[in-house]
Amino acid sequence: MHLDWTLVLASRIRKVKCDEKKPCCQKCIDTGRTCDGYESPFRVVTSRSIINGARASGIPGAASRPVRPALTEISPADIDLLNRYFSTKTMFDVKLGCDEEAREVLEASLTDPTVRHAVSSLRSLREHLETSGDVSASAAQQSPSYGYDYGVQQYCMALGGLASNLSSPGSNALKSALLCCQIFISIEQVRGNYGTMAQHIIQGLGIMHEYRARPTLDDANNLVPAHHAQLPLLDAFVIKLFAAPCKFAEPSATADKEGGKAVSMCAISRHEQTVGSRNLRTIVPDMRTELTRISTSTLDFLVKVSSVDSAGNALRLLPEKTALLESLKSWLMDLELVHADIKSPGTEPLAVSFLRLFHQILKIILVEALNSSSNLQAELRTENDRLQGIGSIIDERVQSQRKNSSALDLIDNRLKCPA
């Protein structure tokens, strides 16, 4: 597998010319890039440029705001805070259950600068989200913010450090990569860039499989033991992120909290919540409940895979894997029947698109489990492309939602304050 985080970094500081409609052409959305003529939100910025920009924009206290020192010890409060920052769902009082993952990341950040930069980025971007209500690139460019710029700078530094480490991957570099990948997924979720989030998921799951974070079977059904160094289990982390309750899809859900504009992993627009939402609210929770049940069973299955110590034990788990894949297949068929009247993925409720994303992630995780056969890569390319496609569709929907929201706000302001 090609560990190309260098490409991910380069795509954020390079502009691309294309003949499609800017700035939402499919070519650029799929690669996480920005059309030529549009400023990349992932530009590399220095501390001096951030300070100068803050002074020029008149942001109170931004120029003199001190950079918080790195942690020297880990407290329960630190763990709880990072666990909360892993997902925007926690802004709506949802419990995530990633305390151990948070502890592992924070412990690594004490000695690993790359992980430390990633944590710092997530913290800054999440704090900016909670204070401003939006961390979209357009919002940041219209209202420059030290927190946003600093978060982007730290993200670029983490990506650069990771690409350098993976030029000769050893156990420490692999652990760093998987921990950073967890944080990168959370960063892109905070920023609402679901196509790029999908890229990080694909990349991280690929590293897990290639370097055997869990035991597997070869073509001859011989056991291939797990990597000698215990690697972070990114698959379990991602499942927990998506399986956490989504208040937007629950019958008792209300509109976004205190008028905030953040889009969660299961967000539904205000229009979708008020127009024709009665049927959606009775259908989506049921579909989500079943998918969550499958994800819980998948987590249990992965625990069993990790403890496999013989080929015989591994082979006895294969029927369970097959049953889970069949459950996913049946779930998708049911979803298509429920939404048979929807002609295009771009017109279905966002909540449904996020369920599709979760379904595809579970499928990839299960396809990779206990499988290192020679034909696996061809199958994974197809499944990864599907995941990337779903992420890109969600990107388009979220960006369109933001534009519509901005336009409505502008009209509303003009009506209130006529020229």
UniProtKB/Swiss-Prot annotation:
InterPro entries: Transcr_Regulatory_Proteins, Zn2-C6_fun-type_DNA-bd_sf, Zn2Cys6_DnaBD. GO terms for cellular component: nucleus. SUPFAM superfamilies: Zn2/Cys6 DNA-binding domain (SSF57701). Induction: Expression is negatively regulated by the leucinostatins biosynthesis cluster-specific transcription regulator lcsF. It is found in: Nucleus. GO terms for molecular function: DNA binding; DNA-binding transcription factor activity, RNA polymerase II-specific; zinc ion binding. It holds the Pfam family Zn_clus. Residues 12-35 bind DNA. Keywords: DNA-binding, Metal-binding, Nucleus, Transcription, Transcription regulation, Zinc. Transmembrane segments: none annotated. This is Transcription regulator lscL. It comes from Purpureocillium lilacinum.
